[in-house]
């Protein structure tokens, strides 16, 4: 596996597109690891400090993710180095998508990612640029559909991603307009935990959970885990956090999600980042959900959690461990050898799987069908891994082996 991984990591990407904005200091990259199956896809992220190497690592992660979620295409990623809170953000995105248009019309598909909203930014800005949908390039390059089928699938994608979730079991509030795009990745991260306990043995009820982040993925996964009977004991976010050894009620977690007006935690009894960072890792929890930025978790934080009862990590963030290696650095290995690590390309494949689902001919466009497709895909991937290795350790390594055999 290590040799396969080294080969995959060191292979140069097929296409690197570099952009410098003419009107601001923004710069960006699209990295396409390969045009496997004639196309590649991966979301667009924006933050201060994005680098080409970060985008390359995420493109490779996407390629592995598509072995689970489908379709069988290459991995790509877009990254823009710019402050997402800058009032010029929208104008920067408009110029970015105008520049990226030739790729998006032919063989590259994108979507929302960190600090870039799928429904309110990516879809409408692409449409203004005569890109029928952000995934048009995948339809052209991979699916090779005729005009009639392309239009039908664009319709399914256009209706499916912003579809409002009304089912009472799936939405935190049926009267608020939570879309599939808002909830589906976090749902998948929590379903990965539920399937893990049903496959490997154990019961979700009463398990304590630490959540890192409070954006869409973190918030939704906390909500669904609390709904299933798990107890959230702490949330840490870039701006601070909360901890409670006895845990928060399902009602309290729901209201934290409802109060959120941004991608950050907002509550009256917030601790500072320093205070929460000091206390949260040793509070004691069986489940850890890293769902903030990439490469945040340190060896010391991992050791503290393991010493205090950690059983399983479900990766809401891509590449959550603070290693410099793209895959399987020392912290990642240390986690995988000691606890159950459900890797990013399985746990957070929800949106990728939803896209793949919408690209099928005549798919059912209702919330239950979409969420079921995601849950079943994650279950199937974990069952494949369990079949090859039924131990509760080295789950990530085994899952990588299965994926890399398809790619190399």
Predicted regions and their residues:
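Short, Gly/Pro- and small/polar-rich lid/capping loops
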Residues: 1-20
